[in-house]
Regions:
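ATP-dependent adenylation/nucleotidyltransferase module used to activate substrates
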Residues: 2-167
Length: 167
């Protein structure tokens, strides 16, 4: 590992403003303290813009000092799905047995960008509100994926990040 020392007593939460990530944010505040918790949100062309507005409001109400909004609008030009295109009716599954709201690589991008932010802010702990038990067919919510990307970002940045999925 590199000589850069990351703070193990702080965390950054991948924060959509939805129910799961809000639960993670509140849990992180309880565990690490308000001053030690950062939030990162993503605008990627998603249908539920209200969640992003909620993320801003929730961070403000909770007193989160460090809330970063990362823009990934280009993602909507790379993939078509019901989560990003309001003209597509949401359905439970398609040919590949994934719901048509599946955005390929979304959580991988979120985790990578958040790890870059965490590295710059000297933060070890990355929290994301995915749950294998409730993954709705999304392969990037599975425990194996989370373990794999944790290893990959640690190797890519020569650090010892810990990705937490407390739900």
């Amino acid at each position: 590992m590199s000589s850069k020392t990351l703070d193990q007593q702080s965390a950054v939460v991948i924060f959509s403003g939805g129910q799961d990530s809000t639960t993670c944010l509140v849990q992180a505040i309880a565990q690490y303290g308000l001053e030690q918790v950062h939030a990162v949100s993503f605008r990627y062309g998603q249908r539920h813009e209200i969640e992003l507005r909620c993320s801003l409001n929730i961070c403000q109400k909770l007193g989160i000092k460090y809330h970063r909004m990362i823009i990934l609008e280009e993602l909507s030009g790379l993939t078509e799905n019901a989560l990003m295109n309001q003209e597509i009716k949401i359905s439970q599954s398609q040919e590949a047995d994934y719901p048509n709201t599946f955005v390929p690589g979304r959580n991988a991008l979120f985790i990578l960008y958040t790890a870059i932010y965490a590295y710059q802010m000297n933060i070890t702990n990355i929290i994301i509100g995915v749950s294998q038990a409730d993954y709705s067919g999304y392969p990037d919510c599975r425990e194996g994926f989370i373990r794999s990307i944790n290893t990959s970002i640690n190797l890519a940045m020569d650090q010892a990040f810990t990705i937490q999925t407390p739900l």
